[in-house]
Amino acid sequence: MSCQPFTSADTFIPLNSDASAALPLRMHHSAAEGLPASNHATNVMSTATGLHYSVPSCHYGNQPSTYGVMAGTLTPCLYKFPDHTLSHGFPPLHQPLLAEDPTASEFKQELRRKSKLVEEPIDMDSPEIRELEQFANEFKVRRIKLGYTQTNVGEALAAVHGSEFSQTTICRFENLQLSFKNACKLKAILSKWLEEAEQVGALYNEKVGANERKRKRRTTISIAAKDALERHFGEHSKPSSQEIMRMAEELNLEKEVVRVWFCNRRQREKRVKTSLNQSLFSISKEHLECR
């Protein structure tokens, strides 16, 4: 088959002219038969200095294609071809035409810089991470020592800061399962809560300690001192204040301890006598009924 590249004696209208009619270029089935057309296409491309993309040879398999060359533009290809086929139709463009827009280049560099900042992983050995881990462990120990549960802490924080705080939040913080940013924010809040909780606990302990100091601890009396007190009780069950003080000095005991011992001993003696009298009365009654 013969090739008919152009009409009008192989002349064409320059791209910068005002003519708007397209110049039809008919490609044939064989690449060898279309060599003249390729030469004219090369001439067209050499004058199109304003293009920013190359156009491949316009045949795909055995399907003929027609491309219109408009004033200053070329219709892009419909299909995407492999890179090694795009070099057959036209010579490569000059490097200035392929240069990237400076504005776009700066934008891409800025985007890459921001992406790097966002995606940059946190150093797990940094002082901030170690400090956060140490606080989480100390917080758990001090919380348990104060007698608070994770639910107690979550409810206390939710009442002040909002419903986003819960038992799950405290649990994730203690187990280091929050993001670094959220954990740092929560650390400041928990530090304040822990400070107030320990102040309340200190006041409570002072109150309990004062009540405990009011109660005197139980005094243990040795066996020898008990024997001496029993002898004094057998002689006189109700000693005077001077006698109690003298016995306390002899036995190396407090006066109040000796006084309380004699009171308790008299009460026990009274209970024994009452129980004995009731037993004797019951025996006498039964003896009389048997008669």
From Swiss-Prot:
CDD domains: homeodomain (cd00086). One of its GO terms (cellular component) is chromatin. The gene is Pou1f1. The lineage of its organism: Eukaryota, Metazoa, Chordata, Craniata, Vertebrata. Transcription factor involved in the specification of the lactotrope, somatotrope, and thyrotrope phenotypes in the developing anterior pituitary. Activates growth hormone and prolactin genes. Specifically binds to the consensus sequence 5'-TAAAT-3'. GO terms for biological process: adenohypophysis development; B cell differentiation; cell fate specification; cell population proliferation; determination of adult lifespan; inositol trisphosphate biosynthetic process; negative regulation of transcription by RNA polymerase II; pituitary gland development. Residues 214-273 bind DNA. It is found in: Nucleus. Interacts with PITX1. Interacts with LHX3. Interacts with ELK1. Residues 124-198 form the POU-specific domain. Belongs to the POU transcription factor family. Class-1 subfamily. Pfam families: Homeodomain (PF00046), Pou (PF00157). Keywords: Activator, DNA-binding, Homeobox, Nucleus, Transcription, Transcription regulation. A motif (9aaTAD) lies at residues 5-13. GO terms for molecular function: chromatin binding; DNA binding; DNA-binding transcription activator activity, RNA polymerase II-specific; DNA-binding transcription factor activity; DNA-binding transcription factor activity, RNA polymerase II-specific; lncRNA binding; RNA polymerase II cis-regulatory region sequence-specific DNA binding; RNA polymerase II-specific DNA-binding transcription factor binding. This is Pituitary-specific positive transcription factor 1. Signal peptide: none annotated. The 9aaTAD motif is a transactivation domain present in a large number of yeast and animal transcription factors.
